[in-house]
């Protein structure tokens, strides 16, 4: 009899014990966001903003019982999140919060994107309810959790709408003119659109990259032919013809006190005489391209993360963070915290980098080299539509690596993010080594001077360490 009562007691305790949030929720969300950035042809800055706010919503939901204390005081102007009215389930709250943020930030996304995200959210809720069963408290817990998550999502969305992004939409920009200034002179042929069927516009969020790359894709193509323009006010596609996001540096940073809180080394002064700093840097680019090995070319393509072909570098590093957290066996809240810290670091890195880019409006290697050294010279990969200094890839990669090293240690890892794009997995001895390879890949591609890469790395390290010091994404 006593044994029977012990068994019954054990069963009752088990039925009341809260179900642990499944860490796979985090990786599922990150894959979805990567797919959205790709099919919507988002630029790196816009992708970083979308990912960062979604990551905030995911983390807030998974730490809902904390009443927002894990985020309070760590993000600029972050609102006080509503307190839960009773016990809530983290997964249900997270899905609800992310759903609200998605519906707000992605209101101008393609219909197929919006419907795919809605189906994903519905499937996650259905799976969670099945996991909870009668142990979860039934309909009341679900309703309470989803209501609380939606309330958090609305608070986060209101916070996002006050970051200055909307003020930059439609704002005219005329770049300064001068021999030392950037001009968007990449030939139109490298931006040739690809013809795709209507069926390929459907995003398969469980493996988005696999369905979006047509068989005839060229590694030089940047833009997929999709019915979406760069003039959207809330979710613009990348603008290849003009200056991409010239006012991005005016956005409110997430962790930095100001966009220029981390200093950057100024670019070399414009000069064409042999032996001058800029001429020497340009000759280094030419020599690197002339002796480019297949391995170096593969590295340039691996880290290109072009808009329209990938989730951009922001999605790439979020995927690295998610995969590494999963390999470590982190809990769902802890994994979401790692993704959040990484996404915030990348977002702030791009606000800082773009602020400096459009402050200095530095000439690109293609323009300088064709004018001064070789009029027929072309880089290995297309030149992006924004100024050179500092290098954006170097900045955001160094920022992400600094945060990941602070949170997880500067440890070896395997990156399989671009497997579906035709790139085999790469093994790295550390996050720092991966970031350094991402930076030098832009030299291999012929689109950055070494000075731009060096400045970007230093800037990114400063941003990443600032984010890490604020404890963003940490849990008690």
Regions found by a protein language model. Give the residues of each.
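Acidic/polar surface patches and capping/hinge elements
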Residues: 18-476
């Amino acid at each position: 009899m006593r044994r029977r009562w012990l068994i019954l007691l054990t069963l009752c305790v088990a039925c009341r014990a809260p179900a642990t949030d499944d860490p796979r929720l985090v990786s599922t969300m990150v894959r979805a966001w990567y797919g959205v950035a790709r099919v919507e042809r988002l630029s790196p800055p816009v992708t970083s903003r979308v990912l960062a706010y979604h990551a905030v919503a995911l983390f807030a939901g998974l730490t809902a019982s904390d009443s927002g204390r894990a985020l309070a005081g760590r993000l600029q102007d972050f609102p006080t999140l509503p307190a839960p009215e009773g016990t809530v389930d983290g997964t249900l709250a997270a899905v609800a919060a992310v759903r609200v943020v998605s519906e707000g930030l992605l209101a101008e996304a393609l219909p197929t994107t919006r419907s795919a995200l809605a189906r994903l959210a519905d499937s996650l809720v259905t799976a969670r309810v099945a996991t909870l069963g009668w142990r979860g408290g039934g309909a009341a817990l679900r309703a309470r959790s989803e209501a609380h998550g939606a309330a958090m999502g609305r608070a986060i969305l209101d916070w996002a709408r006050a970051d200055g992004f909307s003020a930059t939409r439609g704002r005219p920009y005329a770049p300064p003119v001068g021999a030392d200034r950037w001009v968007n002179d990449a030939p139109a042929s490298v931006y040739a659109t690809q013809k795709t069927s209507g069926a390929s516009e459907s995003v398969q969020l469980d493996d988005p990259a696999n369905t979006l790359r047509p068989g005839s894709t060229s590694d030089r193509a940047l833009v997929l032919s999709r019915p979406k323009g760069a003039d959207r006010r809330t979710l613009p596609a990348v603008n290849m013809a003009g200056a991409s996001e010239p006012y991005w540096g005016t956005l409110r940073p997430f962790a930095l006190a100001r966009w220029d809180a981390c200093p950057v080394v100024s670019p070399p002064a414009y000069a064409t005489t042999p032996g001058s700093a800029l001429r020497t840097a340009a000759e280094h680019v030419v020599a690197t391209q002339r002796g480019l090995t297949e391995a170096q070319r593969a590295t340039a393509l691996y880290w290109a993360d072009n808009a329209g072909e990938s989730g951009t570098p922001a999605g790439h590093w979020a995927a690295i963070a998610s995969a590494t957290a999963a390999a470590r066996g982190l809990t769902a809240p802890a994994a979401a915290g790692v993704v959040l810290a990484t996404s915030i670091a990348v977002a702030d890195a791009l606000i800082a980098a773009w602020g400096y880019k459009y402050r200095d409006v530095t000439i690109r290697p293609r323009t300088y080299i064709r004018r001064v050294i070789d009029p027929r010279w072309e880089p290995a990969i297309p030149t992006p539509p924004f100024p050179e200094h500092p290098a954006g890839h170097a900045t955001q990669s160094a920022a992400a690596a600094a945060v990941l090293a602070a949170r997880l240690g500067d440890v070896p890892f395997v990156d399989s993010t671009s497997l579906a794009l035709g790139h085999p997995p790469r093994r790295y001895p550390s996050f720092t080594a991966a970031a350094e390879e991402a930076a030098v890949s832009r030299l291999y591609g012929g689109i950055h001077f070494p000075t731009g890469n060096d400045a970007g790395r230093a800037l990114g390290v400063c941003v990443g360490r600032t984010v890490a010091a604020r404890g963003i994404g940490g849990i008690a």
